[in-house]
Amino acid sequence: MIVGHDYRSYSEAIKKALINGLISTGCNVEDIGLSLSPTVYFAQFNLNSDAIAMVTASHNENGWTGVKMGIKKGLTHAPEEMSELKDITLNKKFVNGKGVLTVSYTHLTLPTKRIV
């Protein structure tokens, strides 16, 4: 799973908590650091990942934040999938596992390789 965060001062801490939770359930996470949402989608394709999570307040005021989540390339979670995630979270229906964290910035140089 590709994970990134926006520029707000609190987003990185939220991303770290998200990553810890994902790893504890067996997800392998590739942290691409400070990013724009389109960069996370770009990294999903170029790093061949099945899912993304972007910690961002998007267009909201400072103090608000959320997580844009996507599965399958180019698709974000639909309301039904978000309801399922909410149910899993509120009812603590987590699976246990041991995921791996990788920190990667290779997605940043990929666009320049196509410039002639």
Where is each model-derived feature located?
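Short intrinsically disordered, low-complexity coil segments enriched in acidic
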Residues: 1-6, 107-116
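Ferredoxin-reductase
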Residues: 1-73
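Gly/Ser/Thr-enriched, mixed-charge loops and adjacent short helices
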Residues: 65-108, 114
